[in-house]
Amino acid sequence: MQTILTDQASFNILTSKRNLINKLTITNIVLWALFVFCAIATAFLAISHSFHKNFSFFLESGNSNNEGETTTKVNIHVLVAQILTPIFTVLLILCWMGNIGINSLLFGQLSICQQFQNEKKWLLWAIFIPQLTLTNSLLVREKLKNILDANSNSSTQKNRLTWWMIGFFVVWFIQLFLGFLIYLPAYSAEARLNLNLSFLSFALNSPLPVGHAANGYFFLGLIFAFMDLTIIVLLVISGFILKHLIQTNKTEHKKYQLMFFWTALAIDVIGLIMTISFIVVSFSLEKGDDYLLKTPFFGSSLMALITIATLVTTILLFIRFNKKRLLKD
């Protein structure tokens, strides 16, 4: 209790500052939502641009009664994709910078507090790693709330951690299922492109034949976009989980730490496999016009690399607060 009063006096924390903390956290979450939306929009625009380019090449050699009108629509779609893609990319960067700013502001307010000295060195990592930006902001907000209100409910925290872990595993299994859809066909690039699907023929009511390369490209691009989404969702969920695991050193949370640690290792391996396979698929395309369709594959490989970086940091954090527990024991 004396420690809480000391921290309260050193910071001169007023009750009104709770609203400021909440507003900063809400802003951080909103920026994260915009970050996720811009990332998904950029991926889908890249897929749309690639597909319509390929579709226009197909129309040039096809026999369609409305070829001129359809080609005009395709060109409009390509133009819209070319205009919106840099806009969403700039918004994505601005959201990322906003998250860094909020993270820095919260840590700047707490720089004189002894309770937060150990977390300051992770601020630099948060500039490069998306996972830690959200984690640090949530951690700081929780510690400030505990300073203002000593009546924290440990059982509520435990229940929240349980639900976050369940959500983490659910999203992870969705990612595994999407990966299974990609690697179910043969391992050659040609087999991946000719998936014998008539999805586009049904959706566009177009004369595309079943098994046409555009079907395979669009379907694979759609799966890759959803895999990018699951990666981002995993980063957000793991941020909340890390906040709980770093904040508490209770023995009852050891099982959650082990589960999260081994799952992180598994996703690390999956991310490495995804990176290698996406790059191989991307650069194994032989046709000249296929180079227009490499953006989704390359973007997914970058997301896989980001995943590996964040999970390596997760492992370092895991080792860090387990070393503290061993020293205390």
Swiss-Prot record:
Its main location: membrane. Disulfide bonds: none annotated. Keywords: Cell membrane, Membrane, Transmembrane, Transmembrane helix. The chain crosses the membrane at residues 29-49, 78-98, 120-140, 164-184, 217-237, 260-280, 299-319. One of its GO terms (cellular component) is plasma membrane. It comes from the Bacteria. It is a multi-pass membrane protein. The keyword tRNA processing does not apply. It is found in: Cell membrane. To M.pneumoniae MPN_129. This is Uncharacterized protein MPN_090. It comes from Mycoplasma pneumoniae (strain ATCC 29342 / M129 / Subtype 1) (Mycoplasmoides pneumoniae).
